[in-house]
Amino acid sequence: MSRIGTFADDDLAGWFAKSPDIGGALGGFSQAVYTKNRLPLRTRELARAVIAHRNECVVCVNTRDEDGPAAGVDEELYEHVHEWRTWPGYSEQERLAAEFADRFATAHTALRDDEDFWSRCAEHFSDELLADLALSCALWVGMGRVLRTLDIGQACKLTIPSRG
């Protein structure tokens, strides 16, 4: 049951009306993360899934992208999310994005100071892609924790609509 309002279990956006200006801005930010992101979809989805599990956000864990299958995002990507360090089905870029997401959600200042990590990142990410990854992770950590804390949408599955 939602901690604010009387929203249906599958209503992920109705609560924005409680704060229309900020909620609307957040909706715009979310839209940009999913429609303007330059990260490869597998890389983005693995990072998102890592944070979803860290946040213990049910709807976030259950979210899928309608464009995913065409981009090589299958259920195996999600099934092995806890094995991002070792599962051979992830590319090095995907693994680095997962590491960034995990550490962003749990140890952000240690991540900032890890020169080895940033050297490895420079081999697989441009500054522009790192900016997209960081901003995306900011959305996912914040929104996932808000949804979980306020118990909003925790009984549903979300499919991100196709952009094609």
How would you describe each model-predicted region?
Residues 91-135:
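Acidic/histidine-rich alpha-helical segments that form the ligand environment
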Residues 83-90:
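Acidic/His metal-coordination segments adjacent to aromatic residues that form catalytic metal sites
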Residues 1-18, 115-130, 136-164:
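Secretory/periplasmic and organellar redox-cofactor proteins
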Residues 1-45, 65-69, 164:
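Mobile cap/lid helix-loop segments that border enzyme active or cofactor-binding sites
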Residues 48-79:
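Conserved alpha-helical segments that form or flank metal/cofactor-binding pockets of metalloenzymes
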Residues 46-51, 81-82, 97-105, 133-144:
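Short alpha-helical scaffolding segments that buttress acidic/His motifs in well-ordered protein cores
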Residues 21-27, 56-60, 107-115:
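Short acidic alpha-helix initiation/capping motifs at coil-to-helix transition points
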Residues 10-14, 41-56, 86, 128-134:
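Alpha-helical scaffold segments that form or flank carboxylate-/histidine-based iron centers
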